[in-house]
Amino acid sequence: METELSETILPTVTKMYVCGPTVYNDAHIGHARIYVIVDLINRTMNKILNKPTHLVMNVTDIDDKIIRESKNKGITWLELARLHENSFFDCMSKLNVTRPDSVIRVTESISDIVLYIQQIINNGFAYIVSDSSVYFDSIEYKKAGYEFSEIDDEEEQQYESLLSKEIVSQKKHHKDFALWKGRSESDVGFNVEFIFDNQTFKSFGVPGWHIECSAMIKKTLGNSIDIHFGGIDLKFPHHYNECLQANAYHHPMYNPLHQSDTMIFHTWTREFIHVGHLCIKGQKMSKSLKNFSTIKEMLDKINSNQFRWLFMSTKWKQQVDFTDGLISIAKELDFTVVNFVNRVSNYPFEVSDVEFNDKETLLHDDFYRIQQRIYSYLTEFKFEMVARSIQHLIGTTNVYLDLPRPNESIVGKIRDYLLDLLDKLGFIYRVGNSSSSHKIKDLMNILIETRSQLRQLTRNPDLSPGIKKQLFDILDRQRNIQLPDIGIILEDSKDSSLWYENSCVQSSE
């Protein structure tokens, strides 16, 4: 059911849907990986590939977990849901994840969900049991010619364990799953009606987990979508059952028996994109296992750029172990960019250095090749290769800057290209307004000249070792502590020094 992305199938506006949070607790960094990757893909399509998108996200704000957790905390389920929904979007904002074009709550879509279920009943693919629950009819679905998996749904089995044997025995097939869960009037739920076998059934209950997304996609995006996002754990049964429901709702639109051999086979969702698990020591990070760090906790340790590098530097389809080493890689990537932009922005280029010789030609050609390579990687959403290419481009340019009389124009173009690319990918780097007035430059030139004279003095063989050490200590403290504290970076070479302001920072926006 999952296929590779193909640019040729994407329409003028790509309709996309991502399964959003179930808001009963704070979001963890496993969730962050999913939504940052979705954001990277969405930004790439819109800002780099020039493919407009319309992204919808649902919020599951009524669920057994929400009800259970609200009782534990002594607040209403709605209070708990709104609390964690606000927390989730606050975290997304801090990660610079673009808000979806449409955010839709389950509680605001009950009537749409009921209509969706009713159509499945009308098409003969659902039935009602004595507690007014509605079940998907897998036997009729298979009879109609649709493929059907016999793999067990653990979540459905867990739900059934809470039901009476009488209700379970009314299921036509053990694979039938709940579209609507009937509840006692004393429980949390909604009053709705269904028509089955020409009879009206009043039901108090809540939607089944899978039906929410199918119905809300229909409400917001129509009969079909182009790309459906989610974590790999949603591939089965959630996304699988969504497809069953959509096929049953639209029957016979997506039935292979009703499509001619000459036409392209139509499916409800053209592409599923599943993001791999973020693991702790090989075990999936999850709220139920309590082996996770929340996004809020991690934002106290790393900034949003480092968060984004964290997920860009690995293959997003694969399972990844979350380690200190992974955090170090992300911090190093962030430092590499900041250091490079600072160096270029404050490099003391000479106005006369406008030559374009062999070394400039080599850098220019390498720059062009890397640009083409990065674009190619972005068309395939190979973000880890983009990260490597950025590192390579910075490394190549830094080597060039170490040569005599570098050309400001080409180096500036590389810096501007990287800043523009990173901005489009959702990073927040800002080059601050340089405070390097002529007076500051004059002062720094005097300081550098004084340092040079003192360093020359230390080479005097008549100078005592004790005095030499004191001079070196003063010079080192000045370079390593005092100047960085006021935002100035000083780099000493054998006979001279280079200075620049630390002007590239993560924006506080």
Swiss-Prot record:
Indicate whether Ubl conjugation appears among the record's keywords: no
Name the UniProt record assigns to this protein: Cysteine--tRNA ligase
Catalyses: tRNA(Cys) + L-cysteine + ATP = L-cysteinyl-tRNA(Cys) + AMP + diphosphate
A Pfam family in this protein?
tRNA-synt_1e
Q: Which UniProt keywords apply?
A: Aminoacyl-tRNA synthetase, ATP-binding, Ligase, Metal-binding, Nucleotide-binding, Protein biosynthesis, Zinc
Organism's domain of life?
Viruses
Chaperone as a keyword?
Answer: no
Please give the SUPFAM superfamilies that the UniProt record associates with this protein: Anticodon-binding domain of a subclass of class I aminoacyl-tRNA synthetases, Nucleotidylyl transferase
